[in-house]
Amino acid sequence: TDDLGTQTSLLMSPDLFRARIKPWLKDLHDHIKSLADVKLIMHSDGAVLPLLDDLIEINIDILNPVQTSVRGLEDTQALKDRFGDRLGYHGGIDVQQLMPNATVQEVRWEVARRIHDLGRSGGYIISPCHNIGPDIPPENVVALYDLAREFGRYPLQLDAELAANNSYFARHS
């Protein structure tokens, strides 16, 4: 559990990661998986998109967090399209801008969109990208919880919620 990225880039070049860090992590993860039937979660903040194929190769099962406020992870539909079920996704709900500043309706839209993008075909644990801070209005936390509880069950049935939110944002943009 080491952060590999910042808001806009990696903390090291992909070549340095592949030469120095990846082999060590691969050995460690292979050893862990030889001892138990477990899923490995990699916690790394930041813009880690350039390393996701590498993380999959070293037996990472779940990326934590899907930090949608960083470069490369904003488009969760493209993320799921590219990596599909080779990776599980944990997070996706932004606590830097969305949760502190959005309306309840905007939070509902974001939650519905993330469930739709990352949850199709399974493999998604919906949650805030990080801790819920004191700057986040309680009604936005409740909106996240309520929508996740209502629509975050399989099989996903979000069509009505997404249609309602699309028309809401078309009228208020």
Regions found by a protein language model. Give the residues of each.
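Active-site loop segments of alpha/beta catalytic cores
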Residues: 1-173
